[in-house]
């Protein structure tokens, strides 16, 4: 989704928090409350595609729903927060990537992600996930990182496979999709020592 930089809901490169350049054209940075409108609009504009694999899409009825989600995360102490990162190119939002379940006691976390169709097939998400794995190990002290993907979602499954994650098994009927059907989830993991050998 293209939004002019003068628009209040444009994706701003220079917000506070962690940010990093991902390849020559793309960046990630921590999402802020100011991003709620552009995140919601991007999801809304791509809802037919995204709802196939992301059951939360139908629950985002208005910008306030995205604001509530971000507020919930931002209210937590930083060490306990499941940090969400925007993926951007200029003032365009391409998708989100972040930590969805973090267990600080056992030093493990899970990464979730989505990318709108026009940016898929370029290796963007693979680079983002790799970067966040390295960051989770070096900055957050994680030992194990997990990714769960619907078994039928080939693009999402390709990312952990490409990065050398181990397929641990299948969580049978692990997620209820928007169409009312349960789908199996492939569960992948990678360890700190494996990430350090990339």
Feature names for model-found ranges:
Residues 51-72:
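Conserved GNAT-fold acetyl-CoA-binding loop/helix
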Residues 61-62, 77, 195:
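A short hydrophobic/aromatic micro-motif that marks alpha-helical segments and, especially, helix-coil
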Residues 75-80, 165:
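Short loop/turn motifs at secondary-structure junctions and domain boundaries
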């Amino acid at each position: 989704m293209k939004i002019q930089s003068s628009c209040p809901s444009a994706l701003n490169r220079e917000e506070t928090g962690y940010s990093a350049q991902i390849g020559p054209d793309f960046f990630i940075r921590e999402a802020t409350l100011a991003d709620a409108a552009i995140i919601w609009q991007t999801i809304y504009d791509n809802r037919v595609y995204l709802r196939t694999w992301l059951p939360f899409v139908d629950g985002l009825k208005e910008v306030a729903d995205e604001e509530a989600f971000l507020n919930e995360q931002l209210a937590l102490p930083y060490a306990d927060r499941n940090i969400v990162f925007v993926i951007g190119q200029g003032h365009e939002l391409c998708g989100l990537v972040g930590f969805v379940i973090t267990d600080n006691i056992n030093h493990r976390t899970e990464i979730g992600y989505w990318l709108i169709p026009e940016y898929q097939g370029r290796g963007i998400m693979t680079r983002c996930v790799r970067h966040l794995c390295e960051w989770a190990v070096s900055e957050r002290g994680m030992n194990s990182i997990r990714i769960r993907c619907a078994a039928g979602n080939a693009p999402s499954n390709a990312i952990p496979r490409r990065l050398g994650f181990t397929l641990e098994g299948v969580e049978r009927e692990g997620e209820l999709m928007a169409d009312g059907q349960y789908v199996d989830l492939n569960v992948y993991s990678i360890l700190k020592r494996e990430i350090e050998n990339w």
